[in-house]
């Protein structure tokens, strides 16, 4: 971890979550309203260091590495891990760091975990923001099908053709998947250092525990994500909520579901952005997020 060159206070350490040590990093004044960040991947928190942009605007940002990720504990087995356990870990970080009622932010897979934590502990958080997140396995699978169906023919047809016959290792399938990833998921010609660093840490054992042996983009999940559905829980939530996505990513479809199921939520999509709008349209992204956070703090 690079040393802190910021004029703002930074602390790092560990909290205990059901017997597992989870690494955290905090940047900003301890008296400032806190934003608790849940990363995707499953990789580590570093690619979301861009949210440090919130600190000069009066916020404290707290990141942590999930179980099996980054500098947190890497168990030999994820047999006892689940969406609910991951949600409880979010609450453990909040409670042990004495964050009060922080704003909760989750991206991608972390968006799903943030939603899970909010449903389990609705009184623990001041607000909820998801970016490219999803609220059920069915929504995730449906979104991927819609996304692939809407891709240009040169990308779509090799994916669909090879998926139908299970030819996931073919040259044309892998080339089409790489194109989809580069253009419609990452959306960046040059990967920022923090994103590349996080990408190199993806825990494949944990990914397998979540999704199972899912060979293709359109394959159903067979891990502990299978059958997961927060729809009814979200409909009961009464929490200021912001739902974000790019307009060319699969997450735009799951964002619509989250928005529809979350009472009173606000949906914002970033034109031309893929799965990482905080890199692609950074100024606009921060403007939208700050406006939302400040409106909640004023209310």
Show which residues each predicted segment covers:
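Conserved hydrolase catalytic core segment
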Residues: 100-143
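Alpha/beta-hydrolase
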Residues: 160-239
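Conserved loop-alpha-helix segment in the C-terminal half of the alpha/beta-hydrolase fold
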Residues: 231-273
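Active-site loop/oxyanion-hole signature of alpha/beta-hydrolase fold enzymes
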Residues: 63-109, 287
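Flexible "cap/lid" loop of the alpha/beta hydrolase fold
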Residues: 126-167
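N-terminal cap/lid segment of alpha/beta-hydrolase-fold proteins
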Residues: 2-21
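Catalytic active-site module of serine/aspartate enzymes centered on a nucleophile-bearing elbow/loop
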Residues: 264-299
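Conserved HGGG/HGGXW glycine-rich cap/lid loop of the alpha/beta-hydrolase fold
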Residues: 20-74, 79
């Amino acid at each position: 971890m690079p040393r802190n060159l910021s004029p703002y206070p930074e602390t790092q350490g560990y909290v205990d979550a059901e017997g597992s040590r989870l690494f955290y990093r905090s940047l900003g004044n301890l008296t400032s309203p806190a934003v608790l960040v849940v990363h995707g991947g499953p990789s580590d928190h570093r690619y979301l260091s861009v949210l440090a942009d919130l600190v000069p605007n009066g916020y404290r940002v707290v990141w942590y590495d999930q179980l099996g990720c980054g500098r947190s504990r890497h168990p030999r087995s994820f047999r006892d891990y689940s969406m609910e356990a991951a949600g409880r870990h979010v609450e453990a970080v909040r409670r042990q760091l004495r964050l009060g009622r922080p704003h909760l932010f989750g991206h991608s897979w972390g968006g799903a975990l943030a939603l899970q934590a909010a449903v389990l502990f609705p009184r623990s958080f001041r607000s909820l923001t998801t970016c490219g997140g999803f609220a059920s396995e069915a929504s995730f699978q449906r979104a991927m099908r819609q996304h692939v169906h809407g891709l240009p023919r040169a990308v779509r047809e090799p994916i669909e053709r090879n998926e139908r016959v299970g030819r996931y290792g073919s040259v044309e399938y892998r080339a089409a998947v790489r194109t989809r990833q580069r253009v419609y998921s990452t959306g960046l010609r040059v990967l920022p250092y923090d994103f590349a660093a996080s990408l190199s840490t993806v825990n494949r054992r944990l990914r397998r525990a979540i999704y199972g042996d899912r060979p293709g983009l359109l394959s159903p999940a067979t891990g502990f994500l299978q059958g997961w559905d927060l729809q009814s829980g979200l409909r009961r939530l009464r929490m200021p909520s912001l739902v974000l996505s790019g307009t060319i990513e699969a997450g735009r479809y799951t964002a619509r579901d989250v928005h529809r199921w979350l009472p009173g939520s606000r949906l914002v999509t970033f034109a031309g952005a893929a799965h990482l709008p905080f890199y692609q349209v950074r100024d606009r992204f921060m403007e939208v997020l700050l406006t939302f956070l400040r409106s909640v703090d004023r209310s």
